[in-house]
C-alpha cells in the first residue's frame, strides 16, 4: 500500500440476518442473502494518507479486494465484488447495517460462497483497450 499505511478494515459477515440486510442495502449484492459469507472492505480514514494522497485508500483497498477474490478462487470458492463507494446512498445503507463509525468508508462488499456450477471463463481481451508507448486511439 502507499507508504505501507494499510488503510483498510475488513468486516467479515456470516450472520444470516446481516447478510440479508447487506443484500437489501446494495442492489448489486442480492446474492449475499443466500451466501455463507461476505466481506465488507472499508477504507479507514484514520490510516489514510494526508492531502492530495488521501484518496489512495481507494487503490489500496481495491488491491486488497482483488487479492481476496484471487484467494477465494484458489480455494475453489465463488466470489463477486459488488461496489458500494462512491454511491452515497449505498455507503449510507451499508454504514447503517454495520454500524460503521464515521472514519470507515465502505468501498465494496465481496460475496463469497460455493458455486452452483462450474462456469467456463470468458475471453474478455480487447486489443483496442491497449496502447503502446502513447495513446493510439481516435
Q: What residue spans do the PLM features occupy?
A:
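Acidic, surface-exposed loops and disordered segments
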Residues: 1-138
Amino acid at each position: 500500500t502507499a507508504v505501507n499505511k494499510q488503510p483498510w478494515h475488513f468486516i467479515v459477515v456470516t450472520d444470516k440476518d446481516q447478510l440479508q440486510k447487506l443484500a437489501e442495502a446494495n442492489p448489486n449484492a442480492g446474492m449475499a442473502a443466500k451466501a455463507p459469507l461476505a466481506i465488507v472492505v472499508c477504507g479507514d480514514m484514520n490510516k489514510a494518507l494526508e492531502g492530495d494522497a488521501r484518496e489512495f485508500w481507494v487503490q489500496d483497498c481495491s488491491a486488497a479486494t482483488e487479492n481476496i477474490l484471487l484467494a477465494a478462487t484458489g480455494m475453489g470458492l465463488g466470489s463477486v465484488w459488488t461496489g458500494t463507494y462512491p454511491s452515497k446512498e449505498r455507503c449510507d445503507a451499508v454504514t447503517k447495517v454495520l454500524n460503521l463509525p464515521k472514519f470507515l468508508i465502505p468501498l465494496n462488499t465481496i460475496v463469497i460462497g460455493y458455486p452452483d456450477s462450474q462456469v467456463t471463463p470468458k475471453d474478455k481481451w480487447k486489443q483496442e483497450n491497449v496502447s503502446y508507448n502513447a495513446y493510439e486511439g481516435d
